[in-house]
Amino acid sequence: MNNLEKYRPYFLAFLRIVVAYMFILHGTAKFLEFPISMTGGNGAVGDPMLLVAGVIEIVGSILLILGLFTRQAAFILSVEMAYAYFFLHVAGKGNLFFPIANGGELALLYSLLFLYFVFSGAGACALDNKFFKK
């Protein structure tokens, strides 16, 4: 298994980029109605909180894809998704310990993934490595 250790930074970069790409789609769906509409085709989301969430998701995801300010962006995104889980899913439907019952499993998973990036950093192929060398 020690032979796999040399690939850790590259897998971490791959995971970071894929998760950020998947998450940016949530932001564009809220803010731009792309690739799907979150309002049933009735124009951009009118709820100011959803618009703010969409901007945070787009900007944060771009930073993660680039690997720039990775830990800070991941922290903000983790807090956003924890907020979504506790104050939207749990508060709306209950079932704190059963995310599948309140529809919050995706929010909880994203929150934990972003929290992982807070502690692990960006991995390989990140602008953080170029601009903020130790």
Curated annotation (Swiss-Prot):
Domain of life of the organism encoding this protein: Bacteria
Q: What is its main location?
A: membrane
Localization (cell): Cell membrane
Q: Which InterPro entries match?
A: DoxX, DoxX-like_oxidoreductase
Q: Where are the transmembrane segments?
A: 9-29, 49-69, 107-127
Q: How does it sit in the membrane?
A: Multi-pass membrane protein
Name the keywords, alphabetized.
Cell membrane, Membrane, Transmembrane, Transmembrane helix
| Keyword field contains Kinase | no
Q: Name one Pfam family in it.
A: DoxX
| Cellular component terms per the entry's GO annotation | plasma membrane
Which family would the database say this protein is a member of?
Belongs to the DoxX family.
Q: What is this protein called?
A: Uncharacterized protein HI_0886
Protein source organism: Haemophilus influenzae (strain ATCC 51907 / DSM 11121 / KW20 / Rd)
